[in-house]
């Protein structure tokens, strides 16, 4: 969600709060920059209204080659996906849709609404009833499927894949003239298209591709180069520019740099490379903590941002001028965090927002888990045996990115026998891994969240999930983060999935820990503090608290401690509320959709396949077990964007005095 999209979903009153939260994050330099940005955007709008002719491309200039020339042996699902596309079948999020070949690029697959060809930058998409969810249209227009067609051609040499790629490009240029229509409304979307176009350009042979043979081919090349120039200049004119910017800025900078490295045919390409390099070197350190946690506190966007950094980094290596050591070190730290929170079954908690975004078509052609793919790629890039151990094997995408020869070193890394979870504490990001037998068949893994709400003043993609946690046993999820649900669907679902009650934490007075101002806005945040951390052979424990409820009567503070008995595969969770007055509290426990939860005389029995847990809840209080409930909204999990599946939520309600301990015990049996 970009800045403009966030504003579109607010009332006029909450817009005041939004602007205030934005302004709190701005430095003097940011104010000056935004003033200059406003002027440059005004100039860009004037260019859009009367577009300048594209400078003549210097065809004798050769861009950086940053992908291997030889196709790998692993085909993944490339041919299957390529044939689907040629038959008019497109996978948009969880849906397989018959959109035709080529599709109507301005028709939103969600609702089949044909959007007008007006000035893209002035289009608004807040009326989902009229326009559908714009994310579906944007997924289609990222051109990841074009990459799959290029891969299929390189693997087989079959003309139909090359012809299909040509037809998709020609139809897009005809239907989406610069700067008209929804596909010219977002600098981030233009950047993702450029990254995929750069990949396709190399897979099909670059300037000498058979795609460009004959008069028709030369015309296609001219149209493509013209659109590339427009894309890069569009990003340069409309990219995010203030200190509160999040992952869209990283994507925009990555697309700009990749374009400048791949297509140096114009003088402006040097400006694209310079702006991209300087911005990315800054953002990799600003947006990701030194311990590797991306500051949006959203696992899905951690994956997306890492790929932006990766593709720009590979393109920079191709130019012979790589990014700094600090850039690559921060990327390695990001993967060590992913390795830390991934359980023995390969599951990663769904903290914060996720829209299932993938940067590259190489990912959909490979199939499999994008996190595993990144771990394999990182193991080879950094020579990191722990990442290799966690990844387990080289996936097809890594072979396409790094080449078969480079991937041959993977087994050497595995043979070093490194631990698969090199770090368990990520204090700057507020994430801690507790447990026993990590990465073994008997693993008991807890991922505790004592981190901040999110990035910047609005924390657009953070959830109010302070002191929540996940639990997996033997590689099977038990207590989970239910995910995201939807961005633009029914408002009650959006607010529920980002609210505190949809997380494994304690809720006071039925209120969220932070005060929401809209779908992508938190008006009042909380602060978390880690009070104690202990690791020994017998015990793994953490104590933390947050102040999000101090706005309520009695100024309550919630404190939680986790203590894992490493010998008994059990955990005790203790909750306390420190307040001047008694408080009504609710504890929420969200179980995986694969869990069977039953009540017993002593509490609860939870089974996930052959693995069973016993759960003892605090004494007293009222207990309810909800499954797919809409009133209240509980008992749901969202594994994919706009996808809901019933699960089980256990709710405990009661009243507590100042400092009274609520004790919950989970034990493997």
Feature annotation, model-predicted:
Residues 5-28:
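Compositionally biased, charge-rich terminal segments
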Residues 18, 22-26, 34, 46, ...:
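Beta-strand-rich N-terminal accessory domains
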Residues 33-128, 133-140:
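Extended, charge-enriched "interface" segments that sit outside catalytic cores
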Residues 115-332, 336-342, 347:
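Aromatic-lined, polymer-binding surfaces characteristic
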Residues 141, 252, 334, 428-430, ...:
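Residues that flank catalytic or metal-binding motifs in active/ligand-binding sites
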Residues 191, 354-355, 361-367, 371, ...:
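CBM-like, beta-strand-rich accessory domains located in the C-terminal region of large
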Residues 293, 297-479, 531-535:
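Carbohydrate-active enzyme catalytic cores, enriched for enzymes
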């Amino acid at each position: 969600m970009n800045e403009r999209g966030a504003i579109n979903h607010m009332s006029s009153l909450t817009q005041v709060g939004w602007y205030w939260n934005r302004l709190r994050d701005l430095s003097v330099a940011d104010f000056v920059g935004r003033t200059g940005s406003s002027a440059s955007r005004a100039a860009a709008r004037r260019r859009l209204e009367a577009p300048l002719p594209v400078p003549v491309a210097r065809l004798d200039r050769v861009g950086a080659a940053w992908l291997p020339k030889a196709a790998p042996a692993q085909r993944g699902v490339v041919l299957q996906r390529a044939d689907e596309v040629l038959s008019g079948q497109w996978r948009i999020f969880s849906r397989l849709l018959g959109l035709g070949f080529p599709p109507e690029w301005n028709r939103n697959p969600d609702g089949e609404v044909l959007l007008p060809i007006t000035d893209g930058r002035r289009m608004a998409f807040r009326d989902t009833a009229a326009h559908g969810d714009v994310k579906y249209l944007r997924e289609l227009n990222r051109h990841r499927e074009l990459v799959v067609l290029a891969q299929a051609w390189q693997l087989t040499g079959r003309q139909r894949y090359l012809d299909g790629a040509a037809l998709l490009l020609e139809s897009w240029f005809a239907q989406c003239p610069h700067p008209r229509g929804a596909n010219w409304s977002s600098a981030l979307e233009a950047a993702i298209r450029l990254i995929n176009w750069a990949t396709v350009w190399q897979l099909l042979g670059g300037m000498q591709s058979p795609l460009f043979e004959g008069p028709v081919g030369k015309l296609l090349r001219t149209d493509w180069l013209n659109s590339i120039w427009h894309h890069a200049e569009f990003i340069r004119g409309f990219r995010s520019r203030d200190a509160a910017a999040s992952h869209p800025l990283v994507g925009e900078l990555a697309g700009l740099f990749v374009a400048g490295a791949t297509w140096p045919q114009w003088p402006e390409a040097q400006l694209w490379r310079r702006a991209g390099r300087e911005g990315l070197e800054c953002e990799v350190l600003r947006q990701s903590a030194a311990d590797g946690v991306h500051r949006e506190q959203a696992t899905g966007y951690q994956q997306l941002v890492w790929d932006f950094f990766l593709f720009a980094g590979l393109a920079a290596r191709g130019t012979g001028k790589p990014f700094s050591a600090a850039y690559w070190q921060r990327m390695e730290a990001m993967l060590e965090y992913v390795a830390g929170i991934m359980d023995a079954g390969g599951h990663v908690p769904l903290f914060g927002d996720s829209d299932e975004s993938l940067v590259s078509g190489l990912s959909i052609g490979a199939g499999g888990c994008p996190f595993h793919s990144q771990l394999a790629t990182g193991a080879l890039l950094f020579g990191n045996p722990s990442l290799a151990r966690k990844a387990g094997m080289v996936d097809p995408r890594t072979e396409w990115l790094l080449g078969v020869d480079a991937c041959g070193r993977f087994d050497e890394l595995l043979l070093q026998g490194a631990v698969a979870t090199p770090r368990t504490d990520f204090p700057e990001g507020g994430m801690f891994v507790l447990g026993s037998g990590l990465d073994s068949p008997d693993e008991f893994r807890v991922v505790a969240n004592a981190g901040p709400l999110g990035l910047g003043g609005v924390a657009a993609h953070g959830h109010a999930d302070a002191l929540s946690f996940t639990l997996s046993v033997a590689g099977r999820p038990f207590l989970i983060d239910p995910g995201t649900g939807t961005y633009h669907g029914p408002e009650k679902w959006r607010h529920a999935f980002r609210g505190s009650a949809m997380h494994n934490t304690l809720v006071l007075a039925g209120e969220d820990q932070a005060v929401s101002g809209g779908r992508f806005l938190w008006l009042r945040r909380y602060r978390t503090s880690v009070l104690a951390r202990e690791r020994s052979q017998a015990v793994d424990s953490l104590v933390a608290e947050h102040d999000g409820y101090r706005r309520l009567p009695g100024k309550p503070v919630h404190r939680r401690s986790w203590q894992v008995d490493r010998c008994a595969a059990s955990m005790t969770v203790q909750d306390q509320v420190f307040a001047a007055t008694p408080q009504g509290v609710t504890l929420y426990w969200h179980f995986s959709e694969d869990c069977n939860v039953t009540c017993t005389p002593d509490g609860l029995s939870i089974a996930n396949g052959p693995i069973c847990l016993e759960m003892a809840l605090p004494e007293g209080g009222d207990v309810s077990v909800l499954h797919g409930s809409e009133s209240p909204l509980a008992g749901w999990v969202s594994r994919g964007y706009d996808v809901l599946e019933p699960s089980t939520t256990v709710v405990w309600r009661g009243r507590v005095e100042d400092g009274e301990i609520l004790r919950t015990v989970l034990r493997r049996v």
